[in-house]
Amino acid sequence: MRNRSNRRDLMKLMTTIGLVLTFAASAAFAKGQRPARTSPQARAERSDVHKHRLIVLTDIGADPDDTESMCRLLLYSNVIDIEGIVATTSTWKRTFVSPELIRAVIRAYGKVQSNLLKHEPGFPTAEALQALIKNGAPKYGMEGVGAGNDSEGSDWIIQTIEKNDDRPLWISVWGGANTLAQALYKLRATKSAAEVNRLVSKLRVYTISDQDDSGPWIRKNFPKLFYIATPGGDYGAATWQGINLVVPGIDNTTISNAWLAEHIQQGHGALGAAYPDVAYGMEGDTPSWLGLIPNGLCDPEHPDWGGWGGRYKLYRPDVPVADPKTYLGGVPIEPETRPIWTNATDDYTPPVKGEYGRAVHHGEKSFEDFKATLWRWRDDFQNDFAARMDWTTKSYEQANHPPVVRLDQPAAVTFRSGEHIGFSAHATDPDGDSLTYYWFQYPEAGSYEGQVEMSAEDASGIALTAPKVDKPETIHFILRVTDKGRPPLSRYKRVIVTVTP
């Protein structure tokens, strides 16, 4: 605030917000509405109606992390429409594919599926998932692309794209991309240009770097294809490494081997036991689909907004100055011919818990890094993973479930410079847990580069003044609501403010 008058006005606004929230809560309790355990039907109603469609391409068996990512993915199979799982090659595994390893994980899932249904509806049967497993060509990279290289996997991608379904189809590439390349090759060889463009416009691709030479071919030959990647085989330059990076200066407990053993692997039934020990890095492939989880934060159609899978900007990346011999697997970075969604940088200051007074407040140590766009959410998505793994063996009463958050105003609003703004939300918890609110500005997600001062960020409502701007600017505010269950679970709401002069 620039003066005491502004501060008084904002405090009045906050008082009004508090009275409104108190009245709403009292009315709810008067009607018998309390934060209690909910029925499966009510739990289904709170899920996003719109599920994202997904096909996974995996070189499972080349590294234990594919199996780890598969274990996690199946725990979210009720909120993501898995439409195919294709066994592929990669630079690490060039001449054979391993669908039997996918089948083994799904068999383990089948042993716990009935218990998962006690917590949320919609988990598919193991038999339904087994039917989605397909084989890609047992060839490396572009050797498997062209006439005579159709495979069960490439034909399945085409069949799935052609479904009468308006939702985008996400292709999550954990290894080589040549099965997708072959599908695109066949589409171009058998369809009109207009039809190819229509079908390609339905695709959304996220590849974990380039693990064969087909990724650059795809990007060059299909310049309008929505594509997220850090090009080449220089894994150290990739955003996805934020999932398992040990970051000096923060608590890295939730990616430790001890944490995985306690919360994922041991005492969590057949699926937990199927989660292998880390060999190189934990779950390097998971970021390619993590942003599809409906949590109130992620919008996959806007990679520049940021979310559990990281944040990305659309531009044509330069070829970095590096020794090609250092590229893992021998997949070099080629010059990009068009913009792709790739590394973006966040200047992130982790919040800290207050021992006294304000429960949560801004910390003092900041990090400016592209990997921070992902690891900043890591404790939240790791705790979410642990809770879902608990669901495989525990009753509903024994486990924790995420809070439900609702805004008290639209998620997109417009104000003029100098106007006073108030936002509020209310949340309930299906287990009756106490909740902590935390509001913060996400500067990199919007166009306004300045910091906006707000009232106490750990209240259910905040107040602020729209900053002075010379042209329309957008500002993103995030509300994170975390319960005090074990493990603590978080859900979010995003408010996008357009400020006009």
Predicted regions and their residues:
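Surface-exposed, flexible coil segments in extracellular/virion-facing regions
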Residues: 441-465
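Bacterial N-terminal signal peptides
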Residues: 14-26
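Short, surface-exposed loop/turn segments at beta-strand-coil junctions that are enriched for proline
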Residues: 465-471
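N-terminal export leaders
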Residues: 7-11
